[in-house]
Amino acid sequence: MTSAADGPANRWPWAAAMMATAVTCALAGCMTQAPAGRTPSAESTLPPDAATWLLTRAALAQLSTDPVVRAGLQRSPVEEILQPGQVPLPGLAATIVVAFPAVAALEAALAGHRLPAGTRAILYDPEVWSFTPAAEQRDPVRAATTAAALAHAHGLQLIVAPALNLTTVLAPGSSAPRWQRFLDLQLAARIARITDVLDLQAQSLERSSASYANFVREAAAQARSANPGVTVLAGLSANPPGPAVDSQQLTSAILASWPAVDGYWLNLPGRGPQCPTCNPARPAVGIGALRAVIQRGLPSHGRRHPAPGSELAAHRH
């Protein structure tokens, strides 16, 4: 998940058994509004179609240091992204998702039985970077089709998270911003036909809640037009390249884009090989945003698109 700046102003259906909702949700979209003068408590009764939170192992560990956020996450549909070789965090119920930036790496891990016990889903994350082969960058739909076949053959669900920077390879001559090229190329629709979950890497737009929401709404509508059963998530970053963002900007992006999506991939990146232009990690930004969403709540979106394998999440402690 990268965060290159390319916003309008500038610039990973679950199988029936996996769709049953067993994790009550608390974080976003389902907290009832507290009476005036009262703060919503951690004991609020919550409907079953709240926002899903897709989080890396590191992000989940950092966010869980805050008691309010930890309590919310414990009653929310949470998907924990692991890299090959990692083990899930102890003491937190989450559905295990293992991430791969390349189909060959996924195929090798499956053939070698190297996925952690309890893995329920695969995240395929194609981007224009050294981790995704050039052939997959040139045809991410074909690569995602192969990833889906591999995942489904092993009883796993698939999340695909195509980066906006793929458009620099797919439509190199266009002067339109990347988000517009992504829509024009119908990438959301084409990948939605293949995958169980589509993650829209919209984090580069989060500094403007209007720009973020406009792209997310249009891409989500495009995806559901192609596959009404697809689950759609949207990306957020507490630390994208460029000017620093704050918690309010993330909260505003969530409030502006919900209920167009079913949840969010909230990333807390630090500078490293997968994000060489990221600023130093700022987990407090993500914590602040989630605290605000817990306290404010979000309206029910009326859809019944549970998180990947969410009924299984309650059984891992």
Task: Describe each region flagged by the PLM.
Residues 2, 19-20, 32:
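Position-driven detector of the extreme protein N-terminus
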Residues 4-18:
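Bacterial N-terminal signal peptides that target proteins for export
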Residues 5-6, 33, 44, 313:
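Intrinsically disordered, low-complexity serine/threonine-rich segments
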Residues 17-28:
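Bacterial N-terminal signal peptides
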Residues 27-45:
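C-terminal region of N-terminal signal peptides and the immediate post-cleavage residues
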Residues 40-317:
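Glycan-processing catalytic domains of CAZymes
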